[in-house]
Amino acid sequence: MPKRVLKGAAKRAREAKHARDAAKARRLSSFLNVRLNQEHIPHEILPNSASDDKLLDRPVTGADLFAPSSGPSSNSVYPSLLQEEYFWNYFWQTYHVSLCPILDDAQFKQHYQSLLIADGKGRKPSALVDIVVAACMQYHISTLPLGSQSGLVEGKDASVAGRWHYWRGQTLLTYELESLSISTLQCHVLCSIYLCGGSFHNMMDTAMAQAVRTAYILGLHRDLPSTLPEAKREMRRRLWWTVYFMDTRATMKLGRSFMLSESHSMPALCIDSLRVAASSGSTFVPADEDMTWLSFNLRQITLCRTFRAAYTSFHNTDFHLQEGQPIWDRPDALQAGAEIIAKHIPSLDAWCDSVPDALKLKRQDSNSRPFSTDGARVVLELSAPEWLQRQRMLLENTYHHVCVNLFRSMICFPYQPASQVHISENSLPGELATRCAAHAIALTKLTHQVLEETSLLDGWHEAFYCQWDAVMTLIGFVLAYPGSGTVTLEAKSAIHLAIAVSENFGFKFAVGTSASKIVQGLCAKSETLTANEYASAYIGASTQNANIYRIYGGQICGVIDWQNS
């Protein structure tokens, strides 16, 4: 590809990223411009990531996209067959058991063996194998320190490791457009995971759209007759509900509408019984009599259903706002929104109670309980299998992440000077804003402890993005409630922990380092604004007050742009 064409494509990629985050970055930069009398460019408060340009180029060596792997001495950019097996073996202990149980372990290995060429020097093309290898390369290389990362990244960031396998898999998928299969759907789901890890969020969204349409075309929204084999029925259910989960996660991440709608035509939820787990193709030992390795996936799905019910109810409500008016300009509308969200809190509590004890993270403080936001340190049972430890941690992480996204719309700027601001116990929006901050603090403390004491989250890109979401929420909370209240002080402390978390991730992939620098810069600006009692400065004129109010209403404290949702 000509160099200038590549540069132009890279520039468009950066602009696309900035367009995606415009509802956040533009408002925050505008606010800082006004309050600090300094120019802040929107993209300067977004982490630099692999999506800037590093997935746009092609192999420097081994330009034949379909050249078979031929051993460690080959000049091909693809790993040898032994190296491929080394990478895809990670899949079963990571993505398979902790994110997307959509492959049959035994069937995949049989499929891989069937691809091997007789002379043992290569294998036949397979989109599914390529994308599994790409995802596992991205994960594993992201667990290594920057100085120890393999030459397979070719000087690029670990988040784009495996990109040649990804591109080859994408090319192979084009041949399946008119002959869709279960394998096609599996590829689209895994592509979205790979793209999300590399922070290619628009491409991830497109991959998820393809997955949703493919799932409908394959009829996965309808259950198979009970006369067919249970293992086949359960695999189809797991595929459907994994697409459902990934669609929900994309909505939380991007603030866009759901692509897969709730309807009367939905398959039954997955079964996590010992019998079904035994026929799934995987051989993980049950952790308890009422819990198998499939229980984690089932609990994630039921949590997503609880979130979607609350999210849909809130965002489908007509608050009778004027054109261009955000909910944060109308205390009565904000109160009405808070009442809608509050109705779903018992459902979240019921979900916590429904989780099997074997999937819960115990606390070092015997008076604390799982999923709480009291700040108690968790017990990391290092003698438990790694897959089970990761499931426990990720389930609680997901719960806090869901609550942050659900309650964040209640954080807004007050009308009175900062010196008079406090979170009133009698204010329902204030209570939910406090809940939001508490969950962001809990997520941050949990992530920090796990990274400090274990390697469970090393290379886990989604944990980094959940942490980024939490710390930006905390910064918004501190700016909205800049007093010296207990929650604000705890939020400030958690922000500093979040910086340490980003730096930890930054030892493995560059976006972590970039995020750390951005948060440190925003902390400094927050301290400056607080010291100058910035809130009292913008009360002077009603028009100015409204503008500042809107900036934060949609920027940090609301995931989506209300007027364009």
Curated annotation (Swiss-Prot):
Q: Where in the cell is it found?
A: Nucleus
UniProt KW keywords: Nucleus, Transcription, Transcription regulation
GO molecular function term, any single one: zinc ion binding
Instruction: Respond yes or no to whether keyword Cell cycle is given for this record.
Output: no
Q: What GO biological process, any one, is recorded here?
A: DNA-templated transcription
Q: What is its main location?
A: nucleus
- Look up keyword Cytoplasm and say if it applies: no
Region (Fungal transcription factor domain) residue ranges read 204-273
Q: Which domain of life is it from?
A: Eukaryota
Cellular component GO terms, alphabetically? nucleus
Q: What does this protein do?
A: Transcription factor that regulates specifically the 4'-methoxyviridicatin/aspoquinolone biosynthesis cluster.
Name of the protein: Transcription factor asqA
